[in-house]
């Protein structure tokens, strides 16, 4: 605000993005590609980008394409598995690959910093779970997106696929696995930085780290019609105000409190349930080098999606690593570097009953979390040895993973725990927030396209934006789920541009 009471032009932006994680970074990249003239401001309360859930050691799963994550294909009462969610997630990840390929082709994105190939494997070792995996394989392999999936119960082949899982295993124990060679590991922290740094250097994006959103309110004109959003920031130089016609809340677990503060009625339907996580991290680089795959097992009954056990090859800050977990825990924080008061301060008259209803109807989840909290180091090591029989405790250390805030949504049937992510937007599209967790980052491009469709509908329909979007995403307008030829064309293009094999 200037001395004469008018608002300074340098404090007004076309969009304010809150949270310097993968979601805001993806939206910033898309908006800049569609209109390089937009003034964008990104605000982050920490001192750098991607330090919460987007960080590779915080993210519960990387490179999600539903190739190996068994929780996306639950068993149904009729003995078949549900495949719709897996197909949708796979299509979403293909969209991300398509976008990254376009940016790399333009020389705007170095994919070597965040994208690495690693086979995706599902492995199980009880008769019941083998029957489940076989049913999953038979159904998915009939779908074009998963046609390259391979099945094996042959020990020599399984040892080649996942040597650490098979070494030292009882020869009498039945083991089965499926494998997709064209899998990836994605360091979303590195990708976030790869998006943001060139935008910041060119002046296309203003970034303020160490800056917290204190308040967010809608301004009104003299005729009482709604105008810009007024965002109050607290940063190193004190408190200041910025304004924008559009605000995106992409602050991970911190999005819900900000959404509630905005006052939009759509926020009343939501509450959050935080789940924390722990990893066992291998400290032996030679051991980690023996595996180049993500090996997923089957989650325990009642376990949340982020707790599907896996022995996971990851590249963290350019270094190849091996992790096992995650083990679930509970903290009332909504962010890893949040406050213990996050959960209680999010309770409102509109969401208290749904929260209580979810607690009463998800006893298995509550019991699972209690059991996880009680786990001793020896019990965690026992869980690791189920995957890796030769694992030695001295080679592994415990590391705290990121926080996830699962959605609790009010409905006519009462409160329900909603897995996955959801875009919540004001009726006029001037504000949007992303709530929820898995698969999240891997489908960020698809999710941010939904934000554009709901909040920039008129501009997206313009010839200029339409032409630019078509150039970025050549398959846009088509449906790779229903059109195998389109899916094949997308994959051939992405594989060529991103150097993917299989």
Swiss-Prot record:
The gene is mqo. Its EC number is 1.1.5.4. It is an enzyme of class 1 (oxidoreductase). It comes from the Bacteria. GO terms for biological process: tricarboxylic acid cycle. It holds the Pfam family Mqo. It comes from Parasynechococcus marenigrum (strain WH8102). Belongs to the MQO family. This is Probable malate:quinone oxidoreductase. Pathway: Carbohydrate metabolism; tricarboxylic acid cycle; oxaloacetate from (S)-malate (quinone route): step 1/1. Coiled coil: none annotated. InterPro entries: FAD/NAD-bd_sf, MQO. Its cofactor is FAD. Keywords: FAD, Flavoprotein, Oxidoreductase, Tricarboxylic acid cycle.
